[in-house]
Amino acid sequence: MAISRWRIGLHIQQDGIYAIALTQEKSYSALRRWWQLPLEAGTIIDGQIRQPEHLRTALQAWSKTLPRRHQISLAFPAGRTLQKRLARPAVRLGESAQLQWVANSLARELGMSADDLRFDYTDDSVQRAYSVTAAQNSDIAALLTLADNLSLHLLAITPDACALQRFIPLLTPPQRWLAWRDATQWLWATRNGWGRRAREDANTLDELAQALGLPPAEATLCDAEPGGFDPWSAIARLSAPLPKNGAAWAVAIGLALGDA
């Protein structure tokens, strides 16, 4: 009998590590495991890895428990990314030339070397522009080195707020966008956008909506409480016990679900 591949969402937060493993069973996703791993204070500060050895130690024993057939989608802090929209050049470019043009244009706008950037982009044909998400190469390299040292099968590195977009089709009207929060920040997502705001910028969901210029009546919070969106409801087959602080796994769940 073939063993299903574990699809793992891994969200490294400032106060701990949250992970979940799903398998695809015919037309639905099934929960295999979830983990909450402690993280030494000061290891992650404002989304940046300050103590890589502490992070490696925190993940080492966990990594050895994973089956050989696994693939990991790893969260990257939205606060360490930059989103830009670049008007397309008048001349149609081939794929390689287009990639180089985006790299050079982005580097010029940021006043950085193209070699210091990692980026992904999509072509918005309606607006005749490229939507670009960029991060510092050193930040991405640190995660790639971590995964390599732990023999993790890394599938993707995705901005944490972007992972919340996986839940948008599951919202019940009039809800059209959602937010997640921890002690220091808000992450938010709509069908076409995502981002991060510091908690001092908004104390409540209504204040966040006002700051973003989004309709508060169409908002919901990733939360198991009545009126919120429970991210665990996106998994078709669950198995007890589930964590009491379930909202902390929202990003990890979105990553593990992917496009399934």
Where are these regions (language model features)?
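Hydrophobic/aromatic-enriched cytosolic interaction surfaces used to assemble or bind macromolecules
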Residues: 1-260
